[in-house]
Design a protein with these regions (language model features):
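Conserved N-terminal structural module of periplasmic/extracytoplasmic solute-binding proteins
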Residues: 4, 12, 20, 34-35, ...
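Extracytoplasmic/periplasmic substrate-recognition and gating elements
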Residues: 80, 107-114, 215-216, 289, ...
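Hinge/lid segment of periplasmic solute-binding proteins
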Residues: 124, 148-205, 219, 228, ...
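A structural signal for short loop-to-beta-strand junctions that line the ligand-binding cleft
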Residues: 135, 142-143, 173-212, 240-244, ...
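Short, solvent-exposed loop/beta-turn-alpha elements that line the ligand-binding surface or hinge
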Residues: 166-180, 263-286, 334-338, 350-358, ...
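C-terminal capping/gating helix-and-loop segments adjacent to ligand/active sites or protein-protein/ligand interfaces
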Residues: 189, 361, 401-407, 420-474
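Extracytoplasmic/periplasmic solute-binding protein
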Residues: 190-199, 204, 228-276, 319
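Glycine-centered hinge/linker elements that transmit conformational signals in sensory
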Residues: 231-233, 273-303
Length: 480
């Protein structure tokens, strides 16, 4: 089952309108934009594996318990414990967003001491989907868990693992619901039912080292051809032009997705999803050829580097550019605070003769509540704290991501990179999700990401790699 959800960049503009700079509203020029965000639903399950936690094993919930029911512990006045599953280590991290989430957990446990207590279960991002899937398959769904929009969320909605939050938000907690930016629940709604709560919003851009650019004597590229020219000059100067993780396939897939969109725009995704366009079409082959050309300017260790390592190459000054989401700001500034002053941001370049170059890859981070939790009141209290003014101000002023509520924050306190991203978004004409998250299901998305890796490694030509995706669609998508 595939759907196209509308995402309105007016959400972002409303947020900026409420932002305060030294007590005054931002005078940034804003453009109202409505864009089609192609997402996909339905997915296959990942292979299961055992759970690694930071505080012990997960608490098993009674899968027959309804979300709306009161709990025995609450009825007797005893402190109840809930679990929250997250994709980073709350104790060892330097990522500023994760540090902020840890503060939420600590604040929650202190404020609700004697009534509620949340136990965080953590893993790394690469293992997170499989571990969450294993818990869902075992009937041990955490009371609250973090989830991406698109196929990842859809699979848990269709499995009945996530609670319908519509009545809670629109009726029981209408004041809380009213704090969110208009339209922010679009990608989290299924058949009119809200299945998750967003915590922050981010956009994928190109981060660059301004000192290296100045040293080499290059300007920010606006087109793909200019980007290649910049890469050549930076490589000649002895730096890695771009740091990228091919070891984390979605990172390479994000670049591949941008190239596909810059070649054919929203028509590419629409055509693939409605069956009127094949992956072997010239628009995709051209994108694959550009991915291969661009990849020769990645760091030498790109094939094996995980995402965190690739990001470290950038903020340690070894690479001049990093294609990543604004979620990376927290990691960059948290790991190397001094780097903030030399970190610029620009939009992924357009292709001359191609499609609209002003479209952006965007996403939200989200919280889901288990449909079988025995403690819905505690879960909602936690989700509310994740999105209260204290948390949302931290998201912007420290973490550099965009709040999902109408909170007013001081841009002067926020990381410099956030203002650059605000400027880019103010000129954005449309949005899309990650390419792999915009296809029919997770298996199709994985096939796309793996094709991008094959092109980079040279194990397949662009024609061969995209033929593999087409073969997958012919056998498992369109031949059903």
């Amino acid at each position: 089952m595939g759907i196209f959800d509308k995402f309105n960049i007016e959400v972002y503009n409303q947020l900026v309108e409420r932002t305060k700079i030294n007590g005054e509203a931002s005078n940034m020029k804003k453009k109202l934009i409505t864009a089609l965000l192609a997402t996909s639903v339905m997915s296959t399950m990942f292979s299961g594996c055992s759970v690694s936690t930071s505080t012990g094993s997960t608490a098993t919930t009674d899968t027959s318990t309804k979300t709306e029911s009161k709990t025995t512990d609450e009825a007797t006045g005893e402190e109840v414990e809930i679990t929250w599953l997250f994709w980073d280590d709350l104790e060892a991290t330097e990522d500023l967003i994760t540090i902020g989430y840890k503060q939420v957990i600590d604040r929650f446990n202190e404020e609700y001491k004697g009534k509620y207590h949340v136990k965080a279960i953590t893993t790394n991002l690469a293992e997170y989907p499989a571990k969450l899937n294993a818990l869902v398959a075992a009937g041990d769904v955490p009371d609250v868990f973090t989830c991406d929009p698109g196929p990842m969320l859809t699979q848990y909605v269709e499995a009945g693992a996530t609670a319908d939050l519509t009545d809670i938000l629109q009726n029981q907690e209408s004041e809380w619901y009213g704090t969110f930016s208009d339209g922010i629940f679009e990608r989290l709604t299924y058949d009119g039912k809200i299945m998750a709560v967003p915590t922050c919003f981010a956009a994928a851009c190109v981060f660059y080292n301004t000192e290296i650019f100045k040293e080499v004597g290059v300007e920010v590229p606006e087109t793909y051809d200019q980007l290649i020219d910049v890469c050549k000059k930076i490589k000649e100067a002895g730096y890695a032009p771009i740091s990228c993780s091919a070891g984390t396939a979605w990172c390479l897939g994000m670049i591949g997705g941008y190239l596909c969109d810059r070649e054919g725009g929203p028509d590419n995704l629409k055509g693939i999803n409605d069956g009127t366009l094949d992956w072997t079409s010239e628009t995709f082959i051209n994108a694959g050829k550009k991915l291969k050309e661009l990849s020769q300017y990645f760091q030498e260790s790109a094939a094996g580097d995980a995402n965190d390592i690739a990001t470290a190459h950038f903020y340690n000054g070894e690479a001049a550019m990093l294609v990543q989401g604004s979620w990376a700001i927290g990691q960059i500034n948290g790991s190397n605070p001094a780097f903030e002053e030399k970190c610029g941001v620009f939009r992924f370049p357009g292709i001359e003769g191609g499609a609209d170059p002003n479209r952006m890859i965007v996403k939200t981070d989200n919280l889901c509540m288990s449909s079988k939790t025995e403690h819905p009141e505690a879960c909602i209290a936690l989700m509310k704290m994740f999105t209260d003014d204290t948390s949302e101000k931290y998201i912007a002023e420290v973490g550099g991501k965009i709040p999902v509520t109408n909170v007013e924050f001081d841009v002067n306190k926020a990381p410099k990179q956030l203002s650059f991203i605000q400027d880019i978004l103010s000129k954005t004409t449309g949005t899309l999700g990650f390419y792999n998250e915009s296809l029919i299901n997770t298996e199709a998305g994985d096939t796309f990401n793996n094709a991008c890796v094959d092109i980079f490694l040279g194990t397949a030509t662009p024609e061969e790699a995209f033929q593999k995706i087409q073969d997958h669609y012919d056998k498992k998508v369109r031949n059903k």
